[in-house]
């Protein structure tokens, strides 16, 4: 148990990071503002304006107000008298959260750099391909098709804002910074505006997203801290029963000794009791724990996680938030794809002497499809079509030039084909392409006050050739030597390593 406590004990090497003075520096808010401009680039639409009211004059006024206040107590009965943001409460709170998020990320960056060797630090930017969303799907394709059961876990949300503050106390040793964070959360935010549990995932306020994503990721990191330890223990004790290890964690030394005795006496490897392979994936407030083990083992994992989160985080967590599903019968929305493991039947004819017989084999295959109904819902929400999938014009773009309208529609179509290049079936993409193409034509016809047929007859069909060659252009750049068999390549699944965020239309949740 001492080893467990030592492992779960946080690193104390970053205990002298005094971050509170940085909050009163003007350049911190400028860096946070520039970081937000570079990060909030939309694929569907241009950035409507990160914060046009940002200026150093507002920053100076904010810092002056912060200097003049006393934050050593939180007034619960008379909160109106303790307000220091004044009339621009929303603007100032957003600026504080951006600056604070930028400051508290410094210890994490220092910890990452110190953990890397000098060689890895020089080549840290060369590993950007691993950040691609598509890099996850080959991993699932190679590993999940051989597993049996999966735990579908809805990550528990903190029932109190103080839990979010306590998760940072191991990383940020500056008490003043933690006190300001606690004051900010309790004074200007409540739990309903921070995290809502009505949806399958978590929805954050559109303002201060970086700040709350940082708090949420820190909290999830604490929730997942046990997986690393248990995985290391299972790898170290490969010849022990991992189920028994979970139930009798106090006696793992005795179990290890018992394995040595069995191995010495029988001279065999106890392969029957080896830990089945476990794979863990987290996405959008959910997590998946897949295993090759039995239903009984997955049920033990379920109750173990519930008890751990209840005791460690004081959460009211019930077993209904964790579901055990068989992979062959499980289908889920994952990163905009509809992913499932299905049985692909195949028949083999075998002949032995004069007798011949047929052998039916069922091979598990990881399948990825485009969810057509949610995607049409996203297009309808963006005013490209109705909820039934009928294309409509986009009046807000009617004031733009014809070439710019075509370029926008073509860019959206190319991005969708690029993002869904790993789909097993491409027919859905052609329906989406038809909707966007006709929506573009109706937008242009609305601009010129004409019908679609009359406009296309007057302008020529080559006006919309942007949509005819969108996916072929992407593939010709990727596979320049495969032009002869381009159709066969296009029908296969292709995973790209340059996709770092979910497409706006694919992120329908």
Swiss-Prot record:
<dbReference type="InterPro" id="IPR002866">
    <property type="entry name" value="Maturase_MatK"/>
</dbReference>
<keyword id="KW-0694">RNA-binding</keyword>
<dbReference type="Pfam" id="PF01348">
    <property type="entry name" value="Intron_maturas2"/>
</dbReference>
<dbReference type="Pfam" id="PF01824">
    <property type="entry name" value="MatK_N"/>
</dbReference>
<dbReference type="GO" id="GO:0006397">
    <property type="term" value="P:mRNA processing"/>
</dbReference>
<keyword id="KW-0150">Chloroplast</keyword>
<dbReference type="GO" id="GO:0009507">
    <property type="term" value="C:chloroplast"/>
</dbReference>
<comment type="function">
    <text>Usually encoded in the trnK tRNA gene intron. Probably assists in splicing its own and other chloroplast group II introns.</text>
</comment>
<dbReference type="GO" id="GO:0008380">
    <property type="term" value="P:RNA splicing"/>
</dbReference>
<keyword id="KW-0819">tRNA processing</keyword>
<keyword id="KW-0507">mRNA processing</keyword>
<dbReference type="InterPro" id="IPR024937">
    <property type="entry name" value="Domain_X"/>
</dbReference>
<dbReference type="GO" id="GO:0003723">
    <property type="term" value="F:RNA binding"/>
</dbReference>
<keyword id="KW-0934">Plastid</keyword>
<protein>
    <recommendedName>
        <fullName>Maturase K</fullName>
    </recommendedName>
</protein>
<comment type="similarity">
    <text>Belongs to the intron maturase 2 family. MatK subfamily.</text>
</comment>
<dbReference type="InterPro" id="IPR024942">
    <property type="entry name" value="Maturase_MatK_N"/>
</dbReference>
<dbReference type="GO" id="GO:0008033">
    <property type="term" value="P:tRNA processing"/>
</dbReference>
């Amino acid at each position: 148990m001492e080893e467990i406590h030592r492992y779960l004990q946080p690193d104390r090497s970053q205990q002298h990071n005094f971050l509170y003075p940085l909050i009163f520096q003007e350049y911190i808010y400028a860096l946070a503002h520039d970081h937000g401009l570079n990060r909030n680039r939309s694929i569907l639409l241009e950035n409507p304006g990160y914060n046009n009211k940002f200026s150093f004059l507002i920053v100076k006024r904010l810092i002056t107000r912060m200097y003049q206040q006393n934050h050593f107590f939180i007034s619960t009965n008379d909160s109106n008298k303790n307000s220091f943001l004044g009339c621009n409460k929303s603007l100032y709170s957003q600026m504080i959260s951006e600056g604070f998020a930028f400051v508290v990320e410094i210890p994490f960056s220092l910890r990452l750099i110190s953990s890397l060797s000098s060689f890895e630090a020089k080549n840290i930017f060369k590993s950007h391909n691993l950040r691609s969303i598509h890099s996850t799907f080959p991993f699932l394709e190679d590993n999940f098709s051989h597993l049996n059961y999966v735990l579908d876990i809805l990550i528990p949300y903190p029932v109190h804002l103080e839990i979010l503050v306590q998760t940072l106390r191991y990383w940020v040793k500056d008490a003043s910074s933690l006190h300001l964070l606690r004051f900010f959360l309790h004074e200007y935010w409540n739990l309903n505006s921070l995290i809502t549990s009505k949806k399958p995932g978590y929805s954050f306020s559109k303002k201060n997203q970086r700040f709350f994503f940082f708090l949420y990721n820190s909290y999830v990191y604490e929730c997942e801290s046990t997986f690393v330890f248990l995985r290391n223990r299972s790898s170290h004790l490969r010849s022990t029963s991992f189920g028994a290890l979970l139930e009798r964690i106090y006696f793992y030394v005795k179990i290890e000794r018992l394995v040595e005795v069995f191995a010495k006496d029988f001279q065999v490897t106890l392969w029957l009791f080896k830990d089945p392979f476990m794979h863990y994936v987290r996405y959008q407030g959910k997590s998946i724990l897949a295993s090759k083990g039995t239903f009984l083992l997955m049920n033990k994992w379920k109750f173990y996680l519930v008890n751990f989160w209840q005791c460690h985080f004081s959460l009211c967590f019930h077993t209904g938030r964790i579901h055990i599903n068989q992979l062959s019968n499980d289908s889920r929305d994952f990163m905009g794809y509809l992913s499932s493991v299905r049985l692909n039947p195949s028949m083999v004819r075998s002949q032995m002497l004069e007798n011949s017989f047929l052998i039916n084999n069922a091979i598990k295959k990881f399948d990825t499809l485009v969810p057509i109904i949610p995607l049409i819902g996203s297009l309808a929400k963006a005013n490209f079509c109705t909820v039934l999938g009928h294309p409509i014009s986009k009046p807000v773009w009617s004031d733009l030039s014809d070439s710019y309208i075509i370029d926008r529609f073509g860019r959206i179509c190319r991005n969708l084909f690029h993002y869904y290049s790993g789909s097993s079936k491409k027919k859905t993409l052609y329906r989406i392409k038809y909707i966007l193409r006709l929506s573009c034509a109706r937008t242009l016809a609305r601009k010129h006050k004409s019908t679609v047929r009359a406009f296309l007859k007057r302008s020529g069909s080559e006006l919309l050739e942007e949509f005819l060659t969108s996916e072929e252009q992407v593939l010709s750049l990727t596979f320049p030597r495969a032009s002869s068999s381009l159709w066969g390549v296009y029908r296969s699944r292709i995973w790209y390593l340059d996709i770092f965020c979910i497409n706006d239309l694919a992120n329908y949740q």
